[in-house]
Regions:
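Residue-level recognition of short loop/turn positions
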Residues: 50, 97, 154-155
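Conserved phosphate-binding catalytic cores of ATP/NTP-utilizing and phosphoryl-transfer enzymes
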Residues: 55-77, 184-205
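Gly/Thr-rich phosphate-binding beta-strand-loop-beta motif of the actin/hexokinase/Hsp70
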Residues: 66-103, 204-207
């Protein structure tokens, strides 16, 4: 691993730690991630300057300067989720704290041709109308699309879906509807991922 890759990995590790907590401190990050204080200070400074994290208060002091508490900036980036069913289209926008910013459910019958793709693209555009094109490119991390059935994520393929009456069906037409990365998932897997994955080491999702 090159020096640049190591720096990126360290920064990602710090961001992942912060994003899964209401608040934390530089001392806590150093201790929990086994990183030196100079490394933590330099990374936190950079993350604050970029607006990825924010100062959200101060810890009680037993003497000396009060330590600043820091947390993720929820509005730094967003992700969009789309749920496709036989008769409906669901859309949701979440921030970096996994909070739902906006949601909508529309009656839309699934059909396996390009007209459906155009309709999904139109509804998604209207759903994101509070963001201009530049904001969408900068702030939208990607789109996750949930589909009932057996999905091959790498090939962007529905192997089989009883609900949508599909078999070996390419999802590339849906991917082309967006200018950001698109990820496909089985509906049950997507629902499980939407839960707080950091609360439990092992979990079972029943639908």
């Amino acid at each position: 691993m090159s020096g640049l890759e190591k720096k990126f990995a360290t920064k990602s590790k710090i961001v992942n730690y912060i994003i899964n907590r209401e608040s934390t401190s530089k001392v806590e990050i150093s201790k929990e991630l086994n990183l030196s204080m100079p490394t933590v200070l330099s990374n936190v400074k950079d993350l604050l300057e970029k607006g990825i994290i924010i100062e959200i208060g101060e810890y009680e002091s037993t003497g000396g300067r009060k330590a600043k508490s820091i947390g993720i900036n929820p509005s730094y980036r967003y992700a969009m989720g789309i749920v496709i069913t036989a008769n409906h289209l669901g859309m949701v926008l979440v921030n970096l704290k996994y909070e739902i910013v906006k949601s909508e459910r529309i009656r839309l019958k699934f059909v396996s041709d390009m007209s459906y793709c155009s309709q999904v693209a139109d509804f998604a555009t209207k759903f994101l109308d509070h963001m201009n094109d530049a904001e969408q490119k900068e702030k939208l991390l990607g789109v996750g699309i949930s589909i009932p059935g057996i999905i091959n994520q790498e090939q962007k393929l529905v192997i089989k879906s009883h609900a949508l009456k599909l078999e070996n069906y390419s999802l590339s037409f849906l991917e082309q509807a967006f200018s950001v990365p698109v990820y496909f998932s089985n509906d049950a897997n997507a629902a499980m991922m939407a839960e707080d994955m950091n609360t439990y080491q092992n979990a079972i999702y029943l639908s």
